[in-house]
Design a protein with these regions (language model features):
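Alpha-helical multi-pass transmembrane bundles of energy-transducing inner-membrane proteins
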Residues: 117-120, 124-169
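C-terminal regulatory domains involved in ligand/effector binding and gene-expression control
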Residues: 5-16
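Transmembrane alpha-helical core residues of multi-pass small-molecule transporters
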Residues: 14, 37-40, 90, 141-145
Length: 169
């Protein structure tokens, strides 16, 4: 197994650790950490995409001792890497484009929570694209919907708050 084949797992693990670390950071450090995570995940995913284009093959990365129906497994191929590259580019441009507006509309004491929710949304998208088993897909669909609802409610006024609360009910 080549080292680049470990990058999808590293993307998931790095993003999860970054989301946890952002909870104790200042808003400025959390923003920088989130931007670093997006760029690092994008770079690792592009490396995996180049690898899958060169080999023309897909591979399964088994996490643990059991294969897909009973254990967690990641499947990586050309389709997965291309679609995740598009997702990560959209996340990068959205985060950079909305940075000034989010700084104005979100309280400074809650900006690190915004970064945590962005990290969790990105984490769930990475895991959903790469997963090869239903249990992992279900878990990360739940993480994705809760993080997305939290991102909608971060503005804390108007229709966004009502929509987020309705979803949570």
């Amino acid at each position: 197994m080549q080292f680049v084949q470990n990058f999808p797992f590293f993307c998931i693990l790095l993003t999860l650790m970054g989301a946890v670390a952002s909870s104790v950071m200042s808003s400025r450090m959390a923003r920088r950490t989130t931007l670093f995570l997006i760029l690092a995940d994008l770079a690792m995913n592009v490396s995996v995409m180049i690898y899958t284009f060169q080999t023309g093959d897909s591979y399964a990365y088994k996490m643990g001792h059991f294969p897909a129906p009973w254990g967690n497994e990641i499947r990586v191929g050309v389709l997965e890497t291309v679609s995740l590259t598009v997702f990560l580019l959209v996340i990068l441009f959205s985060f950079l484009g909305g940075m000034r507006r989010s700084e104005k509309e979100i309280e400074p004491t809650k900006y690190n929570i915004y970064c945590i929710l962005t990290d969790l949304t990105m984490l769930s998208l990475i895991a959903l694209v790469y997963t090869n088993d239903l249990f992992t897909a279900y878990v990360f669909i739940e993480i994705n919907t809760l993080a997305a609802a939290g991102l909608v409610m971060m503005r804390q006024h108007g229709r966004a708050l009502v929509a987020g609360v309705r979803y949570m009910m």
